[in-house]
């Protein structure tokens, strides 16, 4: 998914994670251990028409980088890159917390990236 800003992407990722966690997995015939992994990166992408799928798509190195995050993210978590975390830190009243998780090897031998676990900032928390 491509959105215009990091805050919208963070809201979307955390809402997807919350919604998934509330699914009645057993009622749906799914294993209780099933979890969702989400990854995010912030950078320019290039729209282009995909003639195979007959629709618009996005391409570029930042799309490839993002695709290498999800496979190494623990289930039930949203991992984001340092570029994404930095974009979220810009507002005067940041709504999100990005906890540094270390340098994590990316999927498919893409190298290593500094990863952050994304969460919402509690409205009662004073910092």
Regions found by a protein language model. Give the residues of each.
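Catalytic beta-strand-to-alpha-helix segment of the class III nucleotidyl cyclase homology domain
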Residues: 2-123
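Short, charged, solvent-exposed linker or helix-capping segments at domain edges/interfaces
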Residues: 125-127
């Amino acid at each position: 998914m491509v959105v215009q800003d990091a805050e919208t992407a963070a809201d979307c990722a955390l809402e997807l994670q919350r919604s998934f966690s509330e699914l009645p997995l057993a009622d749906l015939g799914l294993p209780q251990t099933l979890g969702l992994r989400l990854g995010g990166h912030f950078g320019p992408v290039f729209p282009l028409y995909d003639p195979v799928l007959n629709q618009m798509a996005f391409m570029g190195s930042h799309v490839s980088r993002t695709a290498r995050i999800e496979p190494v993210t623990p289930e039930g978590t949203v991992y984001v890159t340092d570029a994404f975390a930095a974009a979220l830190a810009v507002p005067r009243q940041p709504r999100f917390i990005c906890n540094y998780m270390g340098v994590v090897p990316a999927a498919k031998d893409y190298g290593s990236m500094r990863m952050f676990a994304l969460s919402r900032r509690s409205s009662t928390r004073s910092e």
